[in-house]
Curated annotation (Swiss-Prot):
GO terms for molecular function: serine-type endopeptidase activity. Substrate binds at residues 236-238, 293-297. The active site is at residues 134, 164, 238. It is found in: Periplasm. Residues 281-372, 388-476 form the PDZ domain. Residues 119-280 are annotated as: Serine protease. Pfam families: PDZ_2, PDZ_6, Trypsin_2. This is Probable periplasmic serine endoprotease DegP-like.
Length: 488
C-alpha cells in the first residue's frame, strides 16, 4: 500500500518537475538526463530504506504493557480520548470506546479484573518507560513485554493525569532506549512514524506526516498542545512513540478521532517538548510541580479583539484574578488582555496556559498587557500551583471534573453566563454513579458554597477529609442536591 502511494506521489512529483522546466532544448535535455539517472525505483528504495532504518533502530525500545486494575470496576478514562465529537459525552457508552482501552462494557458490571493494554517506550538503559496515564492509572500490577519477548513486572514511578503521561520502571540493565527530539522544530508535512501494539499486534510500524500542530480544546487532557498526524494510530497504540525520520521521539501517541473506532487518519500525540519536561519531573520527583499565575482567562475572538482595540486576534482576556495570587500581587486586573510574556507573543489562551504550567516556581516573567487601550508591562513572579485536595475528594467518590470554559459551554448549549464546574466522567460502580451523577452535569455548589472553578472547589473541600460532601448539581433546568461520602 505504501509502495503504491509512494510510486503515485513520485510520479506526480517528477511529472510536475518536468512541467516546470524552461522551454529550452538544452535545459530540458539536462533535466531528462538527470531523471534517467535517478529513476523512481531508486527514489522509492531510498525512502523505504529511511523508514526501515528508523523501524530497526526504534522498535527494540518499544514495549507492550498490560495493566491490571486494583478494583473490578475499572476507572473510566476522561472523555477526551475519543477526540472532538459534536457531543463530548456521546462516547461514554460506546462499546468500541471501552474496547479501545481494554475496558469492560458499562452495560454490565465486570465479574473479573480486566487488563488495560497499551504501548510504552524505554527512555533509559536501566528500565524507565514512558506511557500514557490512562494505560496504568488505578493499577494493581503491570506486566511489560519487551521486543525480544522477555516479560517483567513494572512499578509506577509517577503519574500526571493533567497531560495523560506516566512513567513506569522495570528492573533490568543495558536496555535499548529512545531519545527525544525537539517538537518545536517540526513543520506541517514532515514525515511521522508511529510504533505500537494496535489490537495487541506488537511492534506495528505505520507512516504518515505531521498534519497540524498546536491542537487544543479537544477535551483529552487539562493541558493540550497536540501534534496531529495521519500515521495510523489504533487501539493499543496509546503511549507509544511518534518519531521523526531520524528516529527521535517527537510525540507520545495518546488519542484518535473516529466515529466507529477505526483509523480515519486523525491521531494526536503529546509533543516531545511538553512530554520531556513532565517525564523528567516524574522520574526525579515522582510528581509534577507546575507554575501558577492565579488568573482565569478567556480566549480572544474577532469581536473581543475589536472591542479591546487589538491589532489582530490574539492574546488572553483576564476574567478573574485569584486573591493573594502572583497575578493579584503584581497588579493584574479583570479585563486586562495579556498579549505577550518575556517578549513572546501569546497566540492563544491554551498556549499561554501551557507555558505558565511548565515554568518552575519563582520564575520571573514580564507580561505585556493591553489595559484600557494602552500597552503596559507588568513583572510577575510565578509561584507553585496549589495541590488539588478537593479534586482528590471528588475522585474518591468517582467524579472527574474540569473548569467550564466558554468554548465548552457553547458546545454543550449551556448559557455563557452559567457558573459551575463540569463533570466529565463518572466511574462505573462508584458512589457518584449509584447516586445518579452523570457526565455533562454541572456542580453549582459544594457544601452550600457556590463554586465556579476548580480553585473554588479546592478551597471548599480542603478540610472535608472523609466527611459527607453535599453537591448542588444541575442538568438543564433540573437542580438536585446530592450527599456523597468519600470511600476510605
Amino acid at each position: 500500500m505504501i509502495t503504491k502511494q509512494l510510486r503515485s506521489w513520485l510520479a506526480v512529483l517528477v511529472g510536475s518537475s518536468l512541467l516546470a522546466l524552461p522551454l529550452s532544448g538544452q535545459a530540458v535535455g539536462k533535466k531528462e538526463s538527470r531523471v534517467s539517472e535517478l529513476p523512481q525505483d531508486v527514489l522509492l528504495k531510498e525512502i523505504s530504506g529511511g523508514f526501515s532504518k528508523v523501524a530497526t533502530k526504534a522498535t527494540p525500545a518499544v514495549v507492550y504493557i498490560e495493566s491490571f486494575p486494583k478494583s473490578q470496576a475499572v476507572t473510566h478514562p476522561s472523555p477526551g480520548r475519543r477526540g472532538p465529537y459534536e457531543n463530548p459525552f456521546d462516547y461514554f457508552n460506546d462499546e468500541f470506546f471501552n474496547r479501545f482501552f481494554g475496558l469492560p462494557s458499562q452495560r454490565e458490571k465486570p465479574q473479573s479484573k480486566e487488563a488495560v493494554r497499551g504501548t510504552g517506550f524505554l527512555v533509559s538503559p536501566d528500565g524507565y518507560i514512558v506511557t500514557n496515564n490512562h494505560v496504568v492509572e488505578d493499577t494493581g500490577k503491570i506486566h511489560v513485554t519487551l521486543h525480544d519477548g522477555q516479560k517483567y513486572p513494572a512499578t509506577v514511578i509517577g503519574l500526571d493525569p493533567k497531560t495523560d503521561l506516566a512513567v513506569i520502571k522495570i528492573k533490568s540493565q543495558n536496555l535499548p532506549y529512545l531519545s527525544f527530539g525537539n517538537s518545536d522544530h517540526l513543520k506541517v508535512g514532515d514525515w511521522a512514524i508511529a510504533i505500537g501494539n494496535p489490537f495487541g499486534l506488537q511492534a506495528t510500524v505505520t507512516v504518515g506526516v505531521i498534519s497540524a500542530k498546536g491542537r487544543n480544546q479537544l477535551h483529552i487532557a487539562d493541558f493540550e498542545d497536540f501534534i496531529q498526524t495521519d500515521a495510523a494510530i489504533n487501539p493499543g497504540n496509546s503511549g507509544g512513540p511518534l518519531l521523526n525520520i531520524d528516529g527521535q521521539v517527537i510525540g507520545v501517541n495518546t488519542a484518535i478521532v473516529s466515529g466507529s473506532g477505526g483509523y480515519i487518519g486523525i491521531g494526536f500525540a503529546i509533543p516531545s517538548l511538553m512530554a520531556n519536561r513532565i517525564i523528567d519531573q516524574l522520574i526525579r520527583d515522582g510528581q509534577v510541580t507546575r507554575g501558577f499565575l492565579g488568573v482565569t482567562l478567556q480566549p480572544i475572538d474577532a469581536e473581543l479583539a475589536a472591542c479591546y482595540k487589538l491589532e489582530k486576534v490574539y492574546g488572553a482576556l483576564v476574567t478573574d484574578v485569584v486573591k493573594g495570587s502572583p497575578a493579584d500581587k503584581a497588579g493584574l486586573k479583570q479585563e486586562d488582555v495579556i498579549i505577550a510574556y518575556n517578549g513572546k507573543e501569546v497566540d492563544s489562551l491554551s498556549m499561554f496556559r501551557n507555558a505558565v504550567s511548565l515554568m518552575n516556581p519563582d520564575t520571573r516573567i514580564v507580561l505585556k498587557v493591553v489595559r484600557e487601550g494602552k500597552v503596559i508591562e507588568i513583572p510577575v513572579t510565578v509561584s507553585q500551583a496549589p495541590k488539588e485536595d478537593g479534586m482528590s475528594a471528588l475522585q474518591r467518590v468517582g467524579i472527574r471534573v474540569q473548569n467550564l470554559t466558554p468554548e465548552t459551554a457553547k458546545k454543550l448549549g449551556i448559557a455563557p453566563e452559567t457558573k459551575g464546574i463540569l463533570i466529565i466522567s463518572v466511574e462505573p460502580g462508584s458512589v457518584a454513579a449509584s447516586s445518579g451523577i452523570a457526565p455533562g452535569q454541572l456542580i453549582l455548589a459544594v457544601n452550600r458554597q457556590k463554586v465556579s472553578s476548580i480553585e473554588d472547589l479546592n478551597r471548599t473541600l480542603k478540610d472535608s477529609n472523609n466527611e459527607n460532601i453535599l453537591l448542588m448539581v444541575s442538568q438543564g433546568d433540573v437542580i438536585r442536591f446530592i450527599a456523597l461520602k468519600p470511600e476510605e
